[in-house]
């Protein structure tokens, strides 16, 4: 999302306001195409990036894909004070996160080479280092 906002010159909520989610997703694909050709990068995509088949194909071609899994309740804690997430600016953000999770979790699992639970930062890093060094 950072790269999308930087390229657009405006924050993500402004892109959503002006172009809607569809416009944002188009920008997301364009940025992915630019980033995946860079050597030796760690690419952290936005939550909805894998919903588009074209993006999934791009991501899979770029290298090892890791799904950093967290349940909706954990995601709410992590995003509670983040006003830059247009899809969560609703009356019940936990319900929205559960809805997004139900739709996205199977796609993330299908796209990823492996999944890592991301509840504890230190354990997540240790698991990633072990898995990626194989």
From Swiss-Prot:
Top-rank taxon: Bacteria
Keyword Kinase: yes
Gene: aroK
Family as reported in the entry's similarity comment: Belongs to the shikimate kinase family.
Localisation: Cytoplasm
Protein name, as recorded: Shikimate kinase
EC code(s) of this entry: 2.7.1.71
InterPro entries: P-loop_NTPase (IPR027417), Shikimate/glucono_kinase (IPR031322), Shikimate_kinase/TSH1 (IPR000623), Shikimate_kinase_CS (IPR023000)
Keywords in alphabetical order: Amino-acid biosynthesis, Aromatic amino acid biosynthesis, ATP-binding, Cytoplasm, Kinase, Nucleotide-binding, Transferase
Organism of derivation: Neisseria gonorrhoeae
